[in-house]
């Protein structure tokens, strides 16, 4: 009979116990009771936070939005077709966040910061919360640096500064996206990082914008965040916050950023869809009660930092679509009240061939001339006044049969100034050329020309000025002031061009 050796057994047991390294972890698990229309209801998950990420057994992720006494309402970040009733759901213990890095420049990504341009994965070592608090009052400073859009009508009369939030509002097909994309094109060489967020748009429209950026060399400093019309409502709702998180990454590194939200009407509609499916009580136009907070917490993240924080900035240009020019609808009034001004695009002006179709009368920038260089202030004041007088006189002229000579001259000048504001798409002008163009119009040099000749004359003048008087651009760009020397050079160029132009017309 074999004898039991107690010390040997003891040694084996000790070795086995020492080798045992199984970790015990606590996981917050729930079970699906209902799923459909991008919403899942879960029982369990007692310790879940509002906005926490959850993971379903088949891999889909979701965000906990409704925390009710009996169940949790989850919005799905995917189609959720494989999720089954009774399957397990695990809380991750994390709020939604995305990776961030310089490697995102030049890429097209979705709301989860995953690349969708077929150019491989993006390597990032850092991450940021999709929703982070806006900078406080103490960390900000007032807007004082101009952000040039390259559009004469905006830079002269509705100036935008770095750190400002300026709404672009108008009916569909009035050129809202064109104004935003031209602004991005004009940032070339300005050391501004641009983020273009496309929400609920057709894939063909987004592809067209990306192609334009590639052709004009703007993709080098631009990130495109795109969620198309066929994307789940949750991802359309998240896309602007993803864009803001990427822009913030650069802003906190003392860089200047520009972010376009195209457009926030579709984000509000996606949020309304989610809220109604979660059975939240509807309010005005069936939007939930917190739809104002949806946009205010997004747009308040745009800021101009003070010198202690490195003077970085994030300029936001949200776009909102109106129905038949109705700016008193719920979403337009909300966003107008949050932003620092609005650029109103009119369908009537667009159809009349005035493009960009900016209605200068009801557009406003609440930052004003603080966001203009001195040279622009010197020439733009007269332009605003003359266009306002022209609009008033034009309305009166419709009913008056005979007008005196002064009024006729004023109307003729106004028509030429309106012609001067027209610009073709993807053709932004540097501020030096804008100053020259406005000066030519407001000083009456265009009065002798036919309206049809104005565009051709100005194009040739800008080229002539660039070729023969390069000192003009140097003076404006270095001193930011319209000096006497600059004015003399410009007058000479205008006179030379008028003579050349009259000879051309005669031949």
From Swiss-Prot:
Recorded GO MF terms: ADP binding; ATP binding; proton-transporting ATP synthase activity, rotational mechanism
Places the protein is found: Plastid, Chloroplast thylakoid membrane
Xref: Gene3D superfamilies: 2.40.30.20, ATP synthase alpha/beta chain, C-terminal domain, P-loop containing nucleotide triphosphate hydrolases
Top EC class, one word: translocase
One Pfam family it belongs to: ATP-synt_ab_C
Known role: Produces ATP from ADP in the presence of a proton gradient across the membrane. The alpha chain is a regulatory subunit.
Family of this protein: Belongs to the ATPase alpha/beta chains family.
Name of protein: ATP synthase subunit alpha, chloroplastic
Gene from which this protein is expressed: atpA
């Amino acid at each position: 009979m074999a004898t039991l050796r107690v010390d040997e057994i003891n040694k084996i047991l000790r070795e086995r116990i020492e080798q045992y390294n199984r970790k015990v972890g606590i996981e917050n698990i729930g079970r699906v009771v209902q799923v459909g229309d991008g919403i899942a209801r879960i029982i369990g998950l007692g310790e879940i936070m509002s906005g926490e990420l959850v993971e379903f057994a088949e891999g889909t992720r979701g965000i906990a939005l409704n925390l009710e006494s009996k169940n949790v309402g989850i919005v799905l970040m995917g189609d959720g077709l494989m999720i089954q009733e009774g399957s397990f759901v695990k809380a991750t213990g994390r709020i939604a966040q995305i990776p961030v890095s310089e490697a995102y420049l030049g890429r097209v990504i979705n709301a989860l910061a995953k690349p969708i341009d077929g150019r491989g994965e993006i390597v990032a070592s850092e991450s940021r919360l999709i929703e982070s608090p806006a900078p406080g009052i103490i960390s900000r400073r007032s807007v004082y640096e101009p952000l040039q859009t390259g559009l004469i009508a905006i830079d002269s009369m509705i100036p935008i500064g770095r750190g400002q939030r300026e709404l672009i509002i108008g009916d569909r097909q009035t050129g809202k996206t064109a104004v935003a994309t031209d602004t991005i094109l004009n940032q070339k060489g300005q050391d501004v990082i641009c983020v273009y967020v496309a929400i609920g748009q057709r894939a063909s429209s987004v592809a067209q914008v990306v192609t334009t950026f590639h052709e004009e060399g703007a993709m080098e400093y631009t990130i495109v965040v795109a969620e198309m019309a066929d994307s789940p409502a949750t991802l359309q709702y998240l896309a602007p916050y993803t864009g803001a998180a990427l822009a913030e990454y650069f802003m906190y590194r003392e860089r200047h950023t520009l972010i376009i939200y195209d457009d926030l009407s579709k984000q509000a509609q996606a949020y309304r869809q989610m809220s109604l499916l979660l059975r939240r009580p509807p309010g005005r136009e069936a939007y939930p009660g917190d739809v104002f907070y949806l946009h205010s917490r997004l747009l308040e993240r745009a800021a101009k930092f003070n010198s202690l924080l490195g003077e970085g900035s994030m300029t936001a240009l949200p776009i909102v679509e109106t129905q038949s020019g109705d700016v008193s609808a719920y979403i337009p009034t909300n966003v107008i009240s949050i932003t620092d001004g609005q650029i109103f695009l009119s369908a009537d002006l667009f159809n009349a061939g005035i493009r960009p179709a900016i209605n200068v009368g009801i557009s406003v920038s609440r930052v004003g001339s603080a966001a203009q260089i001195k040279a622009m202030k010197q020439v733009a004041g007269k332009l605003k006044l003359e266009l306002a007088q022209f609009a008033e006189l034009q309305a009166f002229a419709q009913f008056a049969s005979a007008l005196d000579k002064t009024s006729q001259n004023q109307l003729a000048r106004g028509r030429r100034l309106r012609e001067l504001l027209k610009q073709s798409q993807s053709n932004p002008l540097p501020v030096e050329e804008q100053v020259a163009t406005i000066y030519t119009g407001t000083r009456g040099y265009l009065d002798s020309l036919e309206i049809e000749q104005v565009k051709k004359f100005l194009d040739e003048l800008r080229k002539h000025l660039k070729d023969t008087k390069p000192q003009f651009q140097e003076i404006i760009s270095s001193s930011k002031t319209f000096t006497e020397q600059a004015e003399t050079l410009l007058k000479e160029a205008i006179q030379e061009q008028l003579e050349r132009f009259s000879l051309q017309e005669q031949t």
